[in-house]
Amino acid sequence: MSDVRLIFSVQAVRAFLYGFSSILIGASLAQSGLDETSVGIVFTAMLLGMAISSLAVGRWGEAIGRRRVYGALLVVMGAAGTVFALTGSVPFLVLAALTGTLSTDPNESGPITSVEQAMLASTPPTERSRVYGRYNAVAYLAGAAGALVAGGPAALRELLPALPPDQRWLLVMPFGAAVCAVLASRLSSAVEVDASIAPVERGLRRSRSTVRRLAALFSLDAFAGGFIVQSFIVFWFGRQFGADAALMGLVFFGVGLLQAASSVIAGWLGARIGLLNTMVFSHLPSNVLLALIPLSPTLLVAVALLLARSMLSQMDVPARQAYVAALVDPTERTAAAAYTNAARHVVRPAGPALASVSMGMSAGLPFLVAGGLKVVYDIALYFAFRRVRLGDD
């Protein structure tokens, strides 16, 4: 099996686990009797953990070796999942969350993804955007499947009351992580940076200022995204239109399928019109659709706008990953991916808190703020980087 297929296989298992665990972690925390503050601390620790561990990968990843870091992170993911399966103690949950290897999003963008992005960048430049497109499509499809399967334990418990509680089903995490680690152990040395390059020459050097500018812009996009996290959207649809969890589950399953399809299209599009153009010209109209959602007169119109946005909103993800890889030298790719991903996680926790405040002023204000900030991001990104030549040019 080729290195690309091995990475895709690990991504599929990870995304399934994240889709599965994101539902069960939320359900088990709700059943545990923890107050809202404690639950908020746990989820904030997940985001902070991703930022901290991504920075660590960026700083030391190349020196240690991509395969070693990759395997170690997968083992830690299994250990962290085991903690969530066996205890409800907040200090232990926070420590597990701070590893940065758990995610509430099937398409995680933490330290593991940073290493995968760097390894996939070894593909030829003409194929790179398509590879990243398929890589993200795998995550969306597997994550959607994991979320659907997560409803199984509760349904089966109605027939078999003796089945263990939702929390214990998280023990699937260490088994899945073991499968991932075995697959990762089969990666060849081709995914590593050139061994002839001295360690002191690795990490961010020539592209340091460029990556900092890019990370600052990515953080603006992530901050805006924090206003409209999935849980908030479900809450808003329920408050505005009375949509129940069953309906929204189907809606977000559809969202996952559309995002998978759009990732494949983005890979094809990036090879034809350019990565920066793909990022901006797909993302910009999606943000206009986002701002229109609170103006919808009916549930049907709001769902249609949400689905239409989903077809466009994630097309920038594979293009962004390929763009970062092409923008820097090969020895800088792990650091560049890690630092730009970390920048997104540092600011994202502020979004939900501010969304709750803005919703008190107007129910639809979070959508308008998020859409407006994202439009500013798109325009700023285009004008800041439209004349920057990529390393592969």
Give the residues covered by each predicted segment.
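Hydrophobic core of transmembrane alpha-helices in multi-pass small-molecule transporters
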Residues: 12, 80, 90-111, 301-315
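Helix-to-loop junctions at the C-terminal end of transmembrane segments
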Residues: 53-65, 154, 262-275, 359
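Symmetry-related core transmembrane helices of the 12-TM Major Facilitator Superfamily/SLC fold
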Residues: 167-185, 367-383
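Central cavity-lining transmembrane alpha-helices of secondary-active solute carriers
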Residues: 41-58, 253-265
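Helix-loop boundary and gating motifs at the non-cytosolic
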Residues: 1-48, 210-218, 222-252
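Structural signature of the two symmetry-related core transmembrane helices
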Residues: 68-83, 277-292
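Intracellular juxtamembrane helix-capping segments at the cytosolic ends
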Residues: 102-124, 315-328
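Transmembrane alpha-helix termini and helix-breaking/packing motifs in multi-pass membrane transporters
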Residues: 26-27, 31, 143-164, 234-235, ...
